[in-house]
Amino acid sequence: MRGHLFLNQNEYLTVEEFHLIRNMDLPQDFLDFLEIGFRTGLRAVDILNLKKENINLKKERIIGNAQKTNLSMDVALDKISLDILKRRLKNAEVNNLFVDKFGNIYKPGYFGKYYEEAHRNIYPDFLLHKDITSIRRGNRDFLYMHDVSIAEIEYRQCFRSAYDDDLYVEDQSNSLYVINKFLK
């Protein structure tokens, strides 16, 4: 296992925090968002804009294009993420999977307030601000510490430079192994 290189713990969601938050009494939509975000490393905006056609159940992948970069998304799903998305597909009354009771796509700030509430519960004696982008950074750091290649991590997160925009990582088994082993 590699050591911690990139960020200090105030900048990313740790595995310990992830486990604490996922067991809190918070809205299910937020908990689903948290699970998918930490497991896939996708940007919040990409998760919030997931549509039915972005879920390939046969290949067990999220597909489409990233909102920010327009890069191709082809993210292999672990069992828990797949189960969450299957449930959301089954219950979806509109094309988008993360919508409020009126059918409107959630805004990042809606989930941000629950994320901040969770951190206040974890650290009641500290003023600590972690925004929801720390979920994505936590995924990156978590996978990196468990020896998943940078290429695989960046491909899963749709984070590629102009020099490697044709990068394609079909086999994401290292990520799935680490996710399934440590994020039960």
Enumerate the language-model features and the residues they cover.
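The alpha-helix within a helix-turn-helix
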Residues: 37, 48, 154-155
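Catalytic-site neighborhood detector that most strongly recognizes the C-terminal catalytic loop/helix
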Residues: 66-70, 156-184
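Short, basic (Lys/Arg/His-rich) helix/loop patches that form interaction surfaces
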Residues: 23-26, 75, 113-155
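DNA breakage-rejoining catalytic core of tyrosine-based enzymes
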Residues: 1-19, 69-79, 92-94
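Active-site/catalytic core of tyrosine-dependent DNA strand-transfer enzymes
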Residues: 78-127
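Basic, Lys/Arg- and aromatic-enriched nucleic-acid-binding interface segment
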Residues: 2-7, 11-44
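C-terminal secondary-structure termini that scaffold catalytic or DNA-interacting sites
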Residues: 1, 5-8, 102, 180-184
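Conserved tyrosine-mediated DNA breakage-rejoining catalytic core shared by Y-recombinases
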Residues: 40, 49-86
